[in-house]
Structures are given as C-alpha cells and as structure tokens.
C-alpha cells in the first residue's frame, strides 16, 4: 500500500475517535511525507468525565493488554492521569511503524474500546510528534493500576543551536538510568513534527521513591547543569500511572 495513502487512512481513523478539528486533520495529512524509519508514536490528551472514569480504565486495560498479547509491533502503550485530577488523562503509544498502527486500529479490542468510550471523551488533543529517544528495560513492563507508578511529562522548547547537545545529554542519562536504576522503567523523548525544537519528555518510574532517586542522581544533575540554559518554557506534570505496558528492549536514538 502507498505510504501516503496508509498515513491518510490512519489519521482519518484517529480523527473519527478523537474528534480533532478538520484544519488540524488537513495539516497532518498534508505534512511532509518524507520517509521516517523511526518508530511511530502517538500522544493524546483527554478529559474523562467523572461518570466515565471506571469504564475508561477497564476498557483501556482490556485494549492495551490485548495489544501486548496479540500485536508484537505495538511496542509500548501508556495511560496516566494528572496527580490529583483523574479527569485529565494522557496516552502515549509507540509502534514499530505505520503498518503496526493500522493493525491496532483494525483490531477487535481497539474497536471495542472506541465503541465503549471513544465518543464520550472531551477536550481531546492529538499531538503530532516523532520519536527522538526511546529507552526501556530489557524485560517487558506490565503495571496495571498498582497505585504506585509515577510518570512525568516535561515540555520545553530547545535552543535550535543546542538540539544535538540536549539530545546527547538526555540519551546518556536515560541509558544510565535504564541500566542502573531498578525503579526507572522507561524514558521517551518526542518532538513535534513541524516544530522540531518543541520537545516532550516522558519518564516512567515504579514509584515516588524511584523518581526522587533519579532527580537526585549525579547523572541527572550533571545533565541539567549542561542543558538548563538551552531550554525555554519548561513545565512538568506529575502523573499517576494507570496502565503502563511494553514489550521491553527499546533503545532508539534518532540520528
């Protein structure tokens, strides 16, 4: 299948669920179609009405765990909500390629999720992002509503002259943390497709103690000393991890 046609089909499917604006849809479908061999990523924000939160969680567990069981090219699926505000939910998905996204969208478990809760989510936002860095433990991860997992979502703009330095420093810190810190489960860095110096850093921890350990580590402190002057508009949201699953073993660095 033609890659451009496949991309249009996938975006159309996502739009049907998320209800994003037609202008944004046009932007996504007409964007640069050059081949990107990096793993494909999706990032979304939803407002989940209080009365839907239980169903949203149970339907999400069924969808994401089935994906891990049946879709080898669906690499990572993560759902987390803002600490203290279960209505604000974030989803980060990582796939081997566009064909893997299409396979997931066509699956019975995804369609069941859409039918149960898709149209009831509000204030939806779809981020148009690409992979920069993806690091995971070698072993598969499965954290389901354990009440302890913590996810941080940090957003910032990188000085355009310092992108390589910032990427390298994050790479070194994430590689070390994944290797040496038992409670550091995964680190993902994404960038906006059409504003490549706008970055999102997602880091997954087993619990608050693991987050605190990482923030106080010499490696993290050294990284920040090297890059903090190159970052603007830094904001961090601390999220409670709801559903965090992956096959493990990702170690991607964008050239």
Predicted regions and their residues:
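Short hydrophobic/aromatic beta-strand micro-patches
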Residues: 45-47, 92-94, 157, 202-204
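Bacterial N-terminal signal peptides that target proteins for export
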Residues: 2-13
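Short, surface-exposed ligand-recognition loops at beta-strand->loop->(often short) alpha-helix junctions
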Residues: 47-59, 157-167
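A mid-sequence, solvent-exposed acidic-amphipathic segment
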Residues: 160-188
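Glycine-rich beta-strand-turn "strand-cap" elements at beta-sheet edges
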Residues: 25-38, 78-87, 112-150, 155-159, ...
